[in-house]
Amino acid sequence: MKKTSTFQNGLIWFGAGVSLAEILTGTAFAPLGMAKGFAAILLGHIIGCAMMLLAGLIGGRTGRSAMETVKMSFGQKGGLLFAFLNVLQLVGWTAIMIYDGALAVGGIFAIGRWVWCLVIGALIIVWIAVGVTDLGWINKITMAALFILTLVLCKVIFFSGNAMVGIDGESLTFGAAVELAVAMPLSWLPLISDYTRDAEKPTQATWVSVLVYGAVSCWMYVIGMGAAIFTGEYDIAVIMVKAGLGIAALIILVFSTVTTTFLDAWSAGISAESLSAKLNGKKTAIAVTVIGTAAAILFPMDDITGFLYLIGSVFAPMIAVQIADHFILHRDRFAVTADARNLVIWLVGFIAYRLLMGVDTPVGYTLPDMVLTVVLCLLAEKAKPTKQM
């Protein structure tokens, strides 16, 4: 298979970062104010991207897909649980991204949300048909256009002479805000190895991918937060219309949705291959896009906060177990059917995350939950009998 360059990987993750979902999530930070909100965004991304980096390095070192690396900690059958949960997550993300994109574009060109769902879905299928290693010039042109247009959007929001608009109350605590910032890179964590494994220089590609994604994602969050604070407007499409962006707004909204959602659908196909060797990744990715498009047409998906927290509770303890096994204990359970010990530790981590959601910590829930999970892995290893579980 043709290998991807470090530059190509950077472009892929630039496209992932330029996302309407990130901008919309950023608007929720407005009650904190610019300084406190930016601190929460930065801290959350440092935590989330550190985990994303370690997940990518595992895939890069081993040459395995994201869900195949999970089997190194949870065994062949144990890994299937996370492959299944990841496919569900990615179907959900595909639907949410298409819904958000269609809703936003519909605010500019009102020809019906379902029409824009179909247009965006069709473009994603074109991206899938071309394939991740052959996007080449398409990606370069698209990313250049998105970069220029997001700069224009920044100018409209931050340099149009608008005074700060008063935001009532502080409905979001700092800890909850940090967690919302962690959630985006965390949601990409079960995907990154699907791309780093095909890189010419896996370690270099992983670092570049994470740094590019982290920087761009922070930028999108700040655009959303700034839009709410400086314009008092939470609908990014309305801001674009008021700024007279017109066709430029259409390009930003449609192609940012396509370049991000393509990765969701593509990785859903790769994860499905971990579930069954009979499944074809590309065909499954197209099927996921069709399902996501249908769901976006049929169901409302305006509040994704609960979905983001659910992703955190599933995948934070999962990667914590992987980090402990790969980087500290040097333990590989790929050959076993299921690693009961690690599955129990993951379940404890999952429950702990849900309980931590009721506690407001300055660093959110993910970091304490991961520390707890890693400590449990180390204690379990120390306490194990001579014969391994």
Model-derived features with residue positions:
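Hydrophobic transmembrane alpha-helices that form the core helical bundles
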Residues: 78-111, 258-274, 317
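Juxtamembrane transmembrane-helix boundary signature
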Residues: 42-74, 81-87, 381-386
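Membrane-water interface regions at transmembrane-helix termini and the short interhelical loops
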Residues: 27-31, 57, 96, 100-108, ...
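Transmembrane alpha-helical segments of multi-pass small-molecule transport proteins
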Residues: 12-17, 82-87, 108-131, 144-154, ...
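Membrane-interface "cap" regions at the ends of multi-pass membrane proteins
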Residues: 1-36, 134, 173-178, 190, ...
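C-terminal membrane-solvent junction of multi-pass transporters and transport-like membrane proteins
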Residues: 3, 169, 320-389
